[in-house]
């Protein structure tokens, strides 16, 4: 009798504030996600180069360390994986339009928002794998 391993989705969290990043990561890990975390869009772009098709969810802040912002990163991510669930967060107005299908969460958002999005993205991703 073979044992099957439950599907475990992977999320990319891009946030330069360590406390915010850690909170999101803990919530996602509690939702049975593998989590990759980055402080900058440039670091996240390297992750997307290797893993964009295996990601279920990306949550990014708009204001990040480095030269690229989270909206620009969202455009890159969705161009590499149109099925990726992308959430962009900010306490300010967006500097430019989001890519089609991306969601915007105004800060402060609730932990329940992360948990709901994680469940939705994981269910969607599991049906594609």
Predicted regions and their residues:
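Non-catalytic signal-transmission and effector/linker regions of two-component phosphorelay proteins
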Residues: 1-12, 18-19, 25, 54, ...
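Two-component/phosphorelay signaling modules centered on CheY-like receiver
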Residues: 18-37
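Acidic, metal-coordinating helix/loop segments flanking the phosphotransfer/catalytic sites
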Residues: 37-57
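Acidic catalytic/metal-coordinating carboxylates
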Residues: 40, 68-73
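Short amphipathic alpha-helix used as the core "switch/output" element in two-component signaling
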Residues: 45, 71-83
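Active-site residues of response regulator receiver
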Residues: 61-62
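Short loop/helix-cap segments at secondary-structure boundaries that form the rim of catalytic
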Residues: 92-102
């Amino acid at each position: 009798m073979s044992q099957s391993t439950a599907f475990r989705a992977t999320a990319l969290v891009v946030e330069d504030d360590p406390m915010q990043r850690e909170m999101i990561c803990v919530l996602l890990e509690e939702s049975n996600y593998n989590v990759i975390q980055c402080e900058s869009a440039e670091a996240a772009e390297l992750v997307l180069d290797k893993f964009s098709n295996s990601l279920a969810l990306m949550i990014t802040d708009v204001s990040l360390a480095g030269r690229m912002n989270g909206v620009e990163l969202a455009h890159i991510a969705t161009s590499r994986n149109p099925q990726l669930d992308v959430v962009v967060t900010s306490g300010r107005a967006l500097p430019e339009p989001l890519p089609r299908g991306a969601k915007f969460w105004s800060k402060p958002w609730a932990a329940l928002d992360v948990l709901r999005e994680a469940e939705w993205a994981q269910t969607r991703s599991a049906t594609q794998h």
